[in-house]
Structure formats: C-alpha cells, structure tokens
C-alpha cells in the first residue's frame, strides 16, 4: 500500500515538473492586438509598424490553433501626473 501511494505521488510530481515550464512560457498578451491571419498579411511586423504600433509578430492565439494570427504590440501609454 505504501509503495503504491509513493508511486502515485511520484507520478503527480513528474506531471507537475513537466507542465510547469509550459505554463511559465505563456506570454502576456494584454499588450497585443490581433489584426488578422498571417496568411493574408505579407509582413506582419512591417504592417504593424506602418499602423503606428511598436511592431508585430505571428502567434498562435490559442495553444491548439492551427493558423497563426498577426498581433501588433501596443505602445505604452504615457500619463503625466
């Protein structure tokens, strides 16, 4: 009984160790604005720059997405206090 509970604990420990890096790699998308599918935008970064954004890149908006979306990086707002 003790060895089976140790084995089960070890399995959960391994799963946690495997999933933690994947979850840590999730990037902050709060500063990204999707503008369209990358297949229809020739140069995502240049298109975003021409649209007054800092730049852009093609990303999979959802982990299980097949298609990539062009997302532009929003300029930080500067507020004077």
Curated annotation (Swiss-Prot):
| Keyword presence, Acetylation | no
Q: Which cysteines are joined by disulfide bonds?
A: 38-58, 44-70, 48-72
Q: Which InterPro entries match?
A: Scorpion_toxin-like_sf
Signal peptide start-end = 1-26
Location comes to: Secreted
CC terms in the record's Gene Ontology section: extracellular region
Q: Which domain of life is it from?
A: Eukaryota
Q: Per UniProt, which keywords does this protein have?
A: Antimicrobial, Disulfide bond, Fungicide, Plant defense, Secreted, Signal
Q: Name one GO biological process term.
A: defense response to fungus
The keyword Disulfide bond is annotated on this UniProt entry: yes
Q: Which residues cross the membrane?
A: none
Please give the chief subcellular localization of this protein.
secreted
Protein family membership: Belongs to the DEFL family.
- Protein name per its UniProtKB record: Putative defensin-like protein 31
């Amino acid at each position: 009984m003790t060895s089976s509970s140790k084995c089960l604990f070890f399995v959960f420990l391994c799963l946690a160790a495997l999933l933690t890096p994947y979850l840590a790699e999730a990037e902050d998308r709060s500063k990204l604005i999707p503008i369209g599918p990358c297949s229809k935008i020739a140069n995502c970064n240049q298109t975003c720059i021409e649209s007054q954004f800092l730049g852009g890149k093609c990303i999979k908006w959802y982990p299980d997405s097949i298609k990539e979306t062009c997302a532009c990086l929003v300029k930080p707002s500067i507020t004077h206090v």
